[in-house]
């Protein structure tokens, strides 16, 4: 049995099918960089990150956020094997980029906030609980190489 029930998978997939990856990805990554400014050190090549407005309107932040959420979408297609789905990204972030694995958990929590903002009442407590499990599972899978 996987970490999500069939009902939870249905809730996650149902909401995710409505997500605008371009918009939500850029907003989630932008919020991560604003709320947790120490994460900006991994994105110094992105140009102006001097203020919340600069970050949220930064084209490179938006593009990378889209890339992150496209990877997240691919992972959802392999929800019962997140470790396998994210193995290469775990290796990249650990061995080459040296990203603190705690940042994966932070980004997951920011993503949940952004989804709640975008979907309002549709993002009810059951949907949130399912997504919290998913983002925790993705963070764990991305951190796997670190252990």
UniProtKB/Swiss-Prot annotation:
One of its GO terms (molecular function) is organic acid binding. The modification Phosphoserine is found at residues 45, 51. One of its GO terms (cellular component) is hemoglobin complex. The modification Asymmetric dimethylarginine is found at residue 105. Heme b binds at residues 64, 93. It comes from the Eukaryota. Keywords: Heme, Iron, Metal-binding, Methylation, Oxygen transport, Phosphoprotein, Transport. Residues 3-147 form the Globin domain. InterPro entries: Globin, Globin-like_sf, Globin/Proto, Hemoglobin_b, Hemoglobin_oxygen_transport. Red blood cells. One of its GO terms (biological process) is hydrogen peroxide catabolic process. The modification N6-succinyllysine is found at residues 18, 60. Involved in oxygen transport from the lung to the various peripheral tissues. Heterotetramer of two alpha chains and two beta chains. In the cat family (felidae), the oxygen affinity of hemoglobin depends little or not at all on the association with diphosphoglycerate (DPG). Belongs to the globin family. This is Hemoglobin subunit beta-2. The gene is HBB2.
């Amino acid at each position: 049995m996987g970490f999500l029930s069939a009902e939870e998978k249905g809730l996650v997939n149902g909401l995710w099918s409505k997500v605008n990856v371009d918009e939500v990805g850029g907003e989630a990554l932008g919020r991560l960089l604003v709320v947790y400014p120490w994460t900006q050190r991994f994105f110094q090549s992105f140009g102006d990150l001097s203020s919340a407005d600069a970050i949220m309107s930064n084209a490179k932040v938006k593009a990378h956020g889209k890339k992150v959420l496209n990877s997240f979408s691919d992972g959802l297609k392999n929800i019962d094997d997140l470790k396998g789905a994210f193995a290469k990204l775990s290796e990249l972030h650990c061995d080459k980029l040296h990203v603190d694995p705690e940042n994966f958990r932070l980004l997951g929590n920011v993503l949940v906030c952004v989804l709640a903002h975008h979907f309002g009442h549709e993002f009810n407590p059951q949907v949130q609980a399912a997504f919290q499990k998913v983002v925790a599972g993705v963070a764990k899978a991305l951190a796997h190489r670190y252990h």
